[in-house]
Design a protein with these regions (language model features):
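A generic structural signal for short hydrophobic patches within well-formed alpha-helices
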Residues: 11, 38-41, 110-111
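Active-site neighborhoods of divalent-metal-dependent phosphate/nucleic-acid chemistry enzymes
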Residues: 20, 61-124
């Protein structure tokens, strides 16, 4: 059973209105965290900010790539000009580096690239 890196887009929706599937994944210890996602969420306005950030920080983390590794990954996979940003490439690289990991996102461009890399996870 794969473990899932839950992208910022999914977390934002969940924090606005509870996502049953995400709750199930959390309860089954299948959710992974990346420091970039944690940081993106920390930049926003969060109700119960300290509590949420503490809980998220203590989720299992993926193996994270260095900036140099991400640049090499971007070049090797030809991810330039595909409509995703550097943080997204970090998430993709970390997902590839972590055996059995998949990424769940609601961002259409990130999802398309994840699908092309065969690391996308879909809720349906």
């Amino acid at each position: 059973m794969s473990r899932i890196l839950v992208d910022t887009s999914v977390w934002i929706d969940h924090l606005r209105s509870s996502d049953e599937l995400l709750v199930t994944l959390l309860n089954n210890h299948r959710v992974l965290m990346h420091s970039m996602i944690w940081g993106e969420l920390a930049c926003g306005h969060l109700r119960h900010r300290l509590q949420i950030l503490t809980l998220l920080k203590h989720l299992p983390h993926l193996s994270e790539a260095t900036h140099d590794e991400v640049m090499t990954f971007m070049d090797n996979k030809q991810l330039m000009g595909r409509g995703i940003g550097f943080v997204d490439v970090h998430l993709l690289a970390a997902t590839v580096l972590t055996p059995g990991a998949r990424i769940w996102t609601r961002d259409s461009r990130l999802s398309a690239v994840a699908q092309s890399l065969e690391i996308a996870w879909h809720s349906d």
